[in-house]
Amino acid sequence: RRRRSQGSEVNLTGQGQPCHSCGERCPGFLAHRWRKICQHCQCPWEEHGHTASNQDLERSLCRLVSGSQRDSLCESSSDSSVEKYAWVPSGLNPVQVHQFFKCFPEKKIPFINSPGEKYRLKQLLHQLPPHDSEARYCCSLQGEEEEELLLLFSQKRRLENLGRGCVRPVSGTMSGTVCQQCGHQISVGDVAVFASRAGLGFCWHPQCFTCAQCLELLCDLIYFYQDGKVYCGRHHAELKRPRCLACDEVIFSLECTEAEGFHWHTRHFCCFECECPLGGQRYIMKDQRPFCCSCYERLYAQYCDSCGECIGIDEGQLTYGGQHWHASESCFRCGRCGVCLLGRPFLPRHGQIYCSRSCSVLNATPESSFSPSQTDLSFQKETKDVGTSTNHELDGDSINDCTLSGSRRSLSIIDQTPISRAAPIRSLHSSLRGAPKEFSRECPNRRSLPDLNSHTRTPTRVTFQLPLSSEVKESVSLSHPSFTSSSSSDEEEGYFLGEPIPLPPFLRPPGYSAPPTHAPTSTTKKKKKKKDKSCLLS
């Protein structure tokens, strides 16, 4: 019997079945030795369910319900409107069946060869784990004693808690019936789900007949009733016994490991990657999976955007906008002047961080400098006066949280662009020296600071270019220094020495023609030549 519990019949889905989550990325299901996951994609085994395993699955479920309702699991009907469903509640006519499934989202309706049928199969495997009721699906039972405990556990649940919902329309004598889940009244003539374990008159809307723990629809209306609530088989079993997070089986041994609010068989509390025992050792939880320190650093450690080195799990880490830094004065500093920015406001710009706008402008690349044809609008934003960061919350979008390993540090960001908050990173209190030698991860692309010593900086020059006459939309006023002349004090405006003053080229309207001028006298020519000798045009 012990050899049977350790046998190869653990896999219900069959080797090579495709993964519904990963699709073509997974070559097919390859069962782990004792985990209920695929070794290729690491998805749970219910993600690899397929219609080819329906017979084995339904046979197991029929034993679970003592065979009394076998027909409802694979009920067939001569009516074409019912034959299109992979499963229908018993005792309903085609109109009532349509009324029942109309309450569900389309992706959860079990049409044959549809996403709803895959959803049903996945939920059957998840809500009613075969290894919760039959020893031949278990791989972690130690000896006949634990197999007998599993048998007694399954029989007691079947006798005291297991039931199947019955669907029927609400009659006129049951007016005022209220749904036990949402508290709303169920109208007369609408179909409702009745649970005999709950008592007479207790019913639910079809879409409200869900597990009290996971809030998922109770697949095929199979429920376990406990203390006035209905549960799926998985979560009801966890009310009675702890479940191993690694092998997904109910724990019947006298000893188990408890950490992070989860339970493990003592021998199963190991690194998810290398499977080294973690009892009494340091570990890190990621996605509900424990890792040893060396595997975690090898797989998930970040690299500092300043020095390019790996950030160890015991080193402080700052994150912002997808970038990471060591929480040290040598790494988290201004990219221009090198001043430490720990606990101070900083300005992120082009992959670098700066202490002020002046440093970011001085260290700007030629592409981002000002030119007559382009203007950096980010410098035109009106910013608030930001001081040294404190622990209290400040107003405006200029404040963003930067994550420090082990604690949250609020830093002021001199920027008006809203940035999403970064997730906190778990810290450990013990120390770990060095990084694993087998680490072969490449350093991510980073922006490095330019060599400022090889470039000569010149003062910023801003040039302006007046538009052409055809592009002038507004009037342009020019100011000139005022002067008086005794020979022209009584002349009309726009004339000088009796002659009209021509407009400059950039102020001439389209079709402008210069006013006629009289032939100058010899005296005027002499004066003009004399003036030209002492006048410079710039």
UniProtKB/Swiss-Prot annotation:
GO cellular component labels: mitochondrion; plasma membrane protein complex
Predominant location: cytoplasm
Bias (Basic and acidic residues): 435-449
InterPro entries associated with the record: LIM1_prickle, LIM2_prickle, LIM3_prickle, PET_domain, PET_prickle, Pk/Esn/Tes, Znf_LIM
One Pfam entry name: LIM
Record membrane topology: Peripheral membrane protein
Low complexity composition bias: residue spans: 475-488, 514-523
Compartment(s) of residence: Cytoplasm; Cell membrane; Mitochondrion
Record-linked CDD domains: LIM1_Prickle, LIM2_Prickle, LIM3_Prickle, PET_Prickle
PROSITE patterns to which the protein is assigned, alphabetical: LIM_DOMAIN_1, LIM_DOMAIN_2, PET
Tissue expression remark: Predominantly expressed in the epidermal ectoderm.
Function: Involved in the planar cell polarity (PCP) pathway that is essential for the polarization of epithelial cells during morphogenetic processes, including gastrulation and neurulation. PCP is maintained by two molecular modules, the global and the core modules. Proteins of the core module include the proteins Frizzled (Fz), Disheveled (Dsh), Van Gogh (Vang), Prickle (Pk), Flamingo (Fmi, Celsr) and Diego (Dgo). The core module proteins develop subcellular asymmetry, accumulating in two groups on opposite sides of epithelial cells.
Subunit structure: Interacts with vangl2 via its C-terminus. The vangl2-dependent membrane recruitment of prickle3 is a prerequisite for its polarization. Interacts with wtip. Wtip is involved in the recruitment of prickle3 to the basal body.
Name of the protein in its database record: Prickle planar cell polarity protein 3-A
Primary gene name: prickle3-a
